[in-house]
């Protein structure tokens, strides 16, 4: 059997380090076994999927030296490789499940589903759909169809017994069917859910091994049931440990920079980055920690993949990157790599208009723009003295701005400017005297500097967000009680009471 593996990211935001992590191990697995690595785009979320996000996935993975053999951008024998181009296929297979009696039409309205959830929560019973449409008679189904009621197609999950399967990493896994909901497979608008599209695509693309994060383990019984319902042989499942933050919880952008672009723009070597990611979920033989990708591929053994979550430790990444710089980048190549990182012509041409009328001598250049070329700003209390606001109140403004910036569809200086003005209005403070000084301090560690929102364009979304988080950390953050008040104020878009001294 030929080895075929895949990753299937969704183009709904910035490329996550978890995407690179899974892509890396899929690629290593394929290369070690002389197989094929496929990139598939799961773009069925119409509200959030965007072509530019898809392009970002390609750019981020290519920066990390992750290469695929089939995909939307390069084609292949099993395309199309975007789920949005395969809707007719999913509908066909959903209808097949209906005809086999393995699925059923559910006509319940959103209001009825909400009522079910509320009732089960009050009674402390089984959470999820109560399966009322599963027992409709043929005549009742025809009656609802003739009334042109909308419906979804649900998977008919066994009411008792267990799903037992062998995971290549986690070993034998057992899930009672009573704990598994009758999963929606096809929504009322004809769009498939992840579960149907995932299984159909993996089968048609002849995927032999599914290598993914262990957050998908609870969904695997549904996928195995789908394979059995179609009469197909399931692939081998390998569930990888998740990347965790220092707090031991799933890596989250609320506390850590999670975009691949953040690490690229911060000056990490792509070779060191993938070496570091490999160490997160895998142990090489011996005590060496610096390996080339070729070494990892040659010696790879999936049995050495860890079972428990791995801590994404940026200090360890710094160490790995430094070792790569010392051992793998000759002195005569160092300046070329630094220029490639941030002193490249494209970046400097964007910077020069800001610089041209603001320096008296060339010696002023780095003093004015040093914040663009360093990763770790050094804050002090003096730069955060803003009128009579407390440190916690400054954090309210910063956190709310982060939430607002996360909502921006297009990141640019104009959008950030407008977002910051909205925050000033919500909290009833002066934009120029309060919000802008906080941004200068957070993003540049200065009380003033070059044009703020032009500078934000140069910093980019990921580094801007990371610096706002770091500023909050320096200021002491927000207590849990106050965070609850802030969330309420944010939802109501009225933060003035939080800015009034007790």
From Swiss-Prot:
PROSITE patterns according to UniProt: AA_TRNA_LIGASE_I
Gene Ontology molecular-function annotations: ATP binding; glutamate-tRNA ligase activity; tRNA binding; zinc ion binding
Residue positions binding Zn(2+): 106, 108, 133, 135
Cofactor list: Zn(2+)
GO cellular component: cytosol
Motif ('KMSKS' region): 250-254
Catalysis: reaction(s): tRNA(Glu) + L-glutamate + ATP = L-glutamyl-tRNA(Glu) + AMP + diphosphate
GO biological-process terms attached to the record: glutamyl-tRNA aminoacylation
Subcellular compartments: Cytoplasm
Principal EC category: ligase
Alphabetized UniProt keyword annotations: Aminoacyl-tRNA synthetase, ATP-binding, Cytoplasm, Ligase, Metal-binding, Nucleotide-binding, Protein biosynthesis, Zinc
Residue window of motif 'HIGH' region: 9-19
Subunit structure: Monomer.
The protein's role, per its UniProt record: Catalyzes the attachment of glutamate to tRNA(Glu) in a two-step reaction: glutamate is first activated by ATP to form Glu-AMP and then transferred to the acceptor end of tRNA(Glu).
Family recorded in the similarity comment: Belongs to the class-I aminoacyl-tRNA synthetase family. Glutamate--tRNA ligase type 1 subfamily.
Protein's name in the database: Glutamate--tRNA ligase
Species of provenance: Protochlamydia amoebophila (strain UWE25)
Gene: gltX
